């Protein structure tokens, strides 16, 4: 299983990686500070889970999620955001993510999202 974590904040990115490693110790967890680098990786190697920041105001995370969904329609997407739930709800829900977290999410909440993915991972 490959989990791709994307956040432009190094501390948050490290936290996402640590929690992904806890949830799936056997997974290949890749980290990226930009949507562009993450997309380059996914185009070459694919991924099963995309754990990404929405990243206003440019909404790079939504753009990335749309592109990754075209590559793998059954990719599990978990959005992480500083936004309130309503700010980007329509755009987020159109992508049918596996989860949605705020940046204040606890390790337990992140683990719960990773353990309740929409699409099963082999």
Placement of each model-derived feature along the sequence:
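Conserved acidic segment of CheY-like receiver
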Residues: 1-11, 16-17, 50
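Two-component/phosphorelay signaling modules centered on CheY-like receiver
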Residues: 10-30
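Acidic, metal-coordinating helix/loop segments flanking the phosphotransfer/catalytic sites
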Residues: 31-49
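Acidic catalytic/metal-coordinating carboxylates
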Residues: 34, 60-63
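The short loop immediately C-terminal to the conserved phospho-acceptor aspartate in CheY-like receiver
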Residues: 54-55
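Alpha4 helix (beta4-alpha4-beta5 surface) of REC/receiver domains from two-component response regulators
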Residues: 63, 84-99
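C-terminal output helix
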Residues: 105-115
């Amino acid at each position: 299983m490959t989990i791709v974590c994307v956040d432009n904040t190094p501390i948050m990115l490290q936290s996402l990686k640590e929690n992904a490693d806890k949830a799936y110790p056997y997974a290949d967890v890749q980290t990226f500070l930009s949507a562009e680098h993450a997309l380059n990786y996914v185009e070459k190697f694919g991924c099963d889970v995309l754990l990404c920041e929405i990243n206003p105001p440019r909404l790079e995370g939504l753009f990335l999620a749309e592109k990754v969904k075209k590559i793998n329609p059954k990719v599990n997407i978990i959005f992480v955001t500083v936004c309130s739930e309503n700010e980007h709800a329509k755009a987020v829900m159109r992508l049918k993510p596996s989860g949605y977290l705020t940046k204040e999410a606890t390790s337990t909440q992140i683990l719960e999202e990773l353990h309740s993915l929409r699409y099963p991972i082999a």
